[in-house]
């Protein structure tokens, strides 16, 4: 079985830098997303009159599941407290139904890069990595796969590639490849709501039309939306019923899930109408900074309310410039690079949210000049 390269993988997500954390707290403005999360901000997303559930049944959990199923045009949806739990269990259901243990996905997908190969260790699933790690998934890459697969996982947008999205024609070709082989098609839509504006503008396709291509759709409530935690998987009622059993087997059917579901419903209603504005601001930022020497924006053009920005600078110098801006301007830019790609190449992730909207593209241009070492 081929293994994917470990080159240029994201830095460990949870290693702490206390000094940088304290410096970030001292800043009055934050560039990324919605700014720092706090208990008070998260608790404010949970209404006091929330109807509680018991073991995931009833209350706001059921309300959220029904809304997500309708939003995505599926028969049913299930709330799961963890995306890691949700996706591997969903793929397990597809594999069991097709009596094959092989699944196909891009080598930079979350299951391969961030989950300690849980699909393999817990579910005895075998992965076929499709295509080069640094390039988007393509139908041409899929044509090189010559073994039966139970399911094809497609991530929209591809986070580790800066929020890259395929054209509608390319996406349909990838789905058709799986359909022609009797494989299920699963959408890793952790940031699906961030993909919506691109497909609406470029291809006049709605969220319903995107979801209709897939057997099962996973969406996160904390990544692009800023909720407390958790996700939903939507699909056919029989598949979701099986997934519910696996949620229990994974320990995910806890006594009460209502705080997570209530927060999810709040941010879903609050953030979805803003996604088009986030996308427009991301495009404006990318255009504004494209002329800075030593900077490259990925993808180009930007296709979602996020992007990766490559700075041609050493890691120590980059950190020093982040610290200088924080101390002199009380502006927090990047805690760390998303990937350190070489001695003088740092790739950072810029997700656009409410906090980012407070910065004009011109101001961000000035900040990036300083981070790149080409400005005062």
Task: Name each region found by the language model.
Residues 121-173, 358:
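PLP-dependent aminotransferase-class I/II
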Residues 2-7, 98, 289-290, 294-376:
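Conserved C-terminal alpha-helix-loop-beta "cap" of PLP-dependent enzymes
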